[in-house]
Swiss-Prot record:
Entry function: Transports viral genome to neighboring plant cells directly through plasmosdesmata, without any budding. The movement protein allows efficient cell to cell propagation, by bypassing the host cell wall barrier. Increases plasmodesma size exclusion limit. Acts as a suppressor of RNA-mediated gene silencing, also known as post-transcriptional gene silencing (PTGS), a mechanism of plant viral defense that limits the accumulation of viral RNAs.
Swiss-Prot/TrEMBL GO biological process terms: symbiont-mediated suppression of host innate immune response; transport of virus in host, cell to cell
Tagged with keyword Translocase: no
(+)RNA virus helicase C-terminal domain location: 133-229
Oligomeric form and interacting partners: Homodimer and homooligomer. Interacts with capsid protein. Interacts with host AGO1; this interaction targets the host protein for degradation, thereby suppressing the antiviral RNA silencing.
Protein family per UniProt: Belongs to the Tymovirales TGBp1 protein family.
InterPro entries per record: (+)RNA_virus_helicase_core_dom (IPR027351)
Originating organism: Potato virus M (strain Russian) (PVM)
The protein's name: Movement and silencing protein TGBp1
Amino acid sequence: MDVIVDLLYKYKFERLSNKLVCPIVVHCVPGAGKSSLIRELLELDSRFCAYTAGVEDQPRLSGNWIRKWSGQQPEGKFVVLDEYTLLTEVPPVFALFGDPIQSNTSAVQRADFVCSVSRRFGSATCGLLRELGWNVRSEKADLVQVSDIYTKDPLGKVVFSEEEVGCLLRSHGVEALSLQEITGQTFEVVTFVTSENSPVINRAAAYQCMTRHRTALHILCPDATYTAA
C-alpha cells in the first residue's frame, strides 16, 4: 500500500482519510495526472495491474499497461481500476480512480485522496468552471473565449453534448465529436458548441466538453453568454 500512497503524495493528492482500507478511493479533476500516476505505478511494481472503464492505453513493451475493464480480474495481483465512476457496479479491487463530477452514476464512493489541481488546462478555464460551481484550480495560463454560435467559426477540435447540436453541425458540414467520442481524449484547442447559456440539461456532459483542451477553449452559444443558471 505504501508504494501507491507515496505516488499519490508525489502527484500532490490530498489525503482525507487517516485509516486506509481496500479499496483506496481516489478522486480528481481532469488533468490532475491520475493516468500518469497509474502508469508509473505499473512500471515501479509488478504486483500491480490496471484497468479502465474508459479508453485503454496503447500496448507497451513491458506487457503491463492500462487495459480495458472486462469484468474479470487476475488472481494474485493488486488491481487498480480507473474511471470507475462510469460503471454501475463497482468490483472489489485494490484501488479506484475516478472523477465523480464527470459522471451521473450512483456508484461513487467516499474518497480517501483528492486533487483539484489540473495540469492540463489553465487558470482562465478554472475561473469559468468555478463560476459555474466546480472547484478546479491550475497554475498554467490558457485562453477562454465565449462567442455567439452564429457569428464565429469553430477552431480546433469541435465537440458537443446535445444531439440536436450535432445534427446542426453536420448539416453545415462541420466535423465534430460527440461526448462519447471525446472520453479520455485531450486536444490543444477545443470549441464547445451548445444551445444553452448555462450548463443545465446535463452538467456532467458540459463539464467534460469544457475540460478536453490544453491551451484554448472556445464556447459557441446563443448571444455569446455562458454563465451559471
